[in-house]
């Protein structure tokens, strides 16, 4: 049985929502065990609450060492100036021990993201995230154009061949659209299917 981890950081709930739909897609694949976890918050709780960060999230906090237990990891992060959020970077910067052991070599790595604006760095966030995964020897998986939501020209929408994305709006008021959530589910299903093949 393939084991898939959906691991995310979410400030205001947009990436959390995307993660939940990625889990839904992954769970639609028979013979796959799917786990949803988040990385630790690095902002002190009182300060985080004061700026509107969604501190209370149902997903348990992951540990670095457990990453080696999964056949595929789908990472989710909001964008910070075209890069992953500092909380995710801090977590990944602790994976040196896993790198030394080659613990993630051959495992699937996939990424999804959220930005405040339509051209706010979704693709650079995901592709720069890939650099870390490649250093770990992971096999990168995105979202193929077999996913029809990628070519939706009828609305402003996230979604790239590099991974599912959503647009939060500058004030965070926009929630993931139906199309964006469909792409997220597709990514989860696609990764889970490939993880099953690699694990067999």
Curated annotation (Swiss-Prot):
Cofactor binding notes: Binds 1 FMN per monomer.
Residues noted as binding FMN in the record, renumbered to the chain: 10-15, 79-81, 114-120, 135
Domain Flavodoxin-like per the UniProt entry, residue ranges: 4-191
Top-rank taxon, per record: Bacteria
Pfam families reported for this sequence: FMN_red (PF03358)
EC number: 1.6.5.2
UniProt entry tagged with the keyword Amino-acid biosynthesis: no
One cellular component (GO) term of this entry: membrane
GO MF: flavin adenine dinucleotide binding; FMN binding; NAD binding; NADH:ubiquinone reductase (non-electrogenic) activity; NADP binding; NADPH dehydrogenase (quinone) activity
Ligand binding (substrate): 99
Keyword set includes Oxidoreductase: yes
Sequence positions that bind NAD(+): 12
Keywords associated with the record: Flavoprotein, FMN, NAD, NADP, Nucleotide-binding, Oxidoreductase
Similarity-based family: Belongs to the WrbA family.
Protein name per the record: NAD(P)H dehydrogenase (quinone)
């Amino acid at each position: 049985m393939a084991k898939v981890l959906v691991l995310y950081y979410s400030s205001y709930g947009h990436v959390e929502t995307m993660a939940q739909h990625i889990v839904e897609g992954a769970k639609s694949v028979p013979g796959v065990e799917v786990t949803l976890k988040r990385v630790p918050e690095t902002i002190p709780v009182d300060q985080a609450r004061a700026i509107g960060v969604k501190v209370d999230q149902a997903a348990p906090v992951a540990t670095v060492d457990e990453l080696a237990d999964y056949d595929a990891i789908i990472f989710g992060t909001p964008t910070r100036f075209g890069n992953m959020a500092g909380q995710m970077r801090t977590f990944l910067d602790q994976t040196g021990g896993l790198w030394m052991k080659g613990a993630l070599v051959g495992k699937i790595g996939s990424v999804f993201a959220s930005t405040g604006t339509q051209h706010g760095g979704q693709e650079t966030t995901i592709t720069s995230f890939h650099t870390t995964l490649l250093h770990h020897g992971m096999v990168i998986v995105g979202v193929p154009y077999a996913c029809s939501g990628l070519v939706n020209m009828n609305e402003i929408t996230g979604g790239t061949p590099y991974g599912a994305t959503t647009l939060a709006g500058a004030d965070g008021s926009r929630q993931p659209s139906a199309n964006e959530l469909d792409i997220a589910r597709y990514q989860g299903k696609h990764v889970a299917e490939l993880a099953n093949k690699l694990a067999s």
